[in-house]
Amino acid sequence: MVLLSELAAATLIFLTTHIFISTLLSITNGRRLPPGPRGWPVIGALPLLGAMPHVSLAKMAKKYGAIMYLKVGTCGMVVASTPDAAKAFLKTLDLNFSNRPPNAGATHLAYGAQDMVFAHYGPRWKLLRKLSNLHMLGGKALENWANVRANELGHMLKSMFDMSREGERVVVAEMLTFAMANMIGQVILSKRVFVNKGVEVNEFKDMVVELMTTAGYFNIGDFIPCLAWMDLQGIEKGMKRLHKKFDALLTKMFDEHKATSYERKGKPDFLDCVMENRDNSEGERLSTTNIKALLLNLFTAGTDTSSSAIEWALAEMMKNPAILKKAQGEMDQVIGNNRRLLESDIPNLPYLRAICKETFRKHPSTPLNLPRISNEPCIVDGYYIPKNTRLSVNIWAIGRDPEVWENPLEFYPERFLSGRNSKIDPRGNDFELIPFGAGRRICAGTRMGIVMVEYILGTLVHSFDWKLPSEVIELNMEEAFGLALQKAVPLEAMVTPRLPIDVYAPLA
């Protein structure tokens, strides 16, 4: 008994001393770090993140607050989980958090961070961003390729119409990936990259999903650099293998495009424009590697994030048929039943837009923003944030915060139809709803993403009635974590045409 009491006393002294020293260490010249879980030696809070880090971090935020600090491996990480906290980092201190931390995804998938997403904030990043906005992603550029979207959507409608006649189910993600990759291919390369659905497009879809999933993993080597060479999770091996596949595909596209340049005289596409303007006034020149990395960004993010949002929206409407019927009723009243939805109709469809916003809120394409890192130490809400601290904004948690949203777990588009919420815009200025991020490093494809989701979702809802296959009793709404938030079980549906047969075709 004496020994046990001595051990207990020793343990108590050790714990008290440990807590006291830890508290002292968290204060630097009177500057206190944000609160957060203590974790373990060396590995820190890594085990606490689990398979669904956005969910785990949201639960921690309820205990530790809107701004919390974790030691993840040997790296410090600060997490913002409310609109005000996100605004402090992404607006007030935007410039200080304008860079990305080094990570395996940037190294092995993005050509050593030679792309636009992971590039250092500087002249090369600005040139990549400028060319992308000017020739593909900006407002004027989007108008210029509106016919491409409409025509490719016609191909998708015809395919779905044929499947409905044959009694075949539609695998939504596959259909969307096929259409979006072809839209982007026509803008970038002047060609549909997939002529027929089949093995090739399914392999491309699997590659995109794998990239967005593996790039979102919390890789041990990123947080404990001395262990990176061991690749304990096998993540880096998978990234290298996947990169070889993408590089082969991009190299083939690049070479075929170069060989057919004579066909585009006077009608340059995106890649032609980038090649023509690869130098800037500051002496920066985009290499072939930079351009291939940019194409990788555009093809992967351009297909996966938008298709995920549309798939989630359709799943929510099939789970809540009254919402689907209300959306169709609005479209029937505004558009009628004799033609397809046009992009110019969308401003007159407030309920459709509310559905899209509600999807962005409840199922943000990126649950955790792509990480940033502090260039210098700073103070946020009275807390000291050291230099080289990684920043993660929990967009998923903000969208489900009961302090911000009434009944946040309910899919209720009507919340965006009246009052203050009706003015909320998802383009980065209203921090209650930032599905594309905010600040300098906001997703370059924000405008395109919103246009694609509203237009394609609206067209699918207006053109077809939707129901689950007969053997599906209850729709699975579980998530699969990654850079993009996928449905764990892909949505499959039976569709029935609602419009005249001539609507289901490409443009004449």
Swiss-Prot record:
Pathway: Pigment biosynthesis; anthocyanin biosynthesis. Its EC number is 1.14.14.81. One of its GO terms (cellular component) is endoplasmic reticulum. CDD domains: CYP75 (cd20657). It is an enzyme of class 1 (oxidoreductase). The keyword Cell division does not apply. InterPro entries: Cyt_P450, Cyt_P450_CS, Cyt_P450_E_grp-I, Cyt_P450_sf. Catalyzes the 3'5'-hydroxylation of naringenin and eriodictyol to form 5,7,3,'4',5'-pentahydroxyflavanone and 3',5'-hydroxylation of dihydrokaempferol and dihydroquercetin to form dihydromyricetin. This is Flavonoid 3',5'-hydroxylase 2. It comes from Petunia hybrida. The lineage of its organism: Eukaryota, Viridiplantae, Streptophyta, Embryophyta, Tracheophyta.
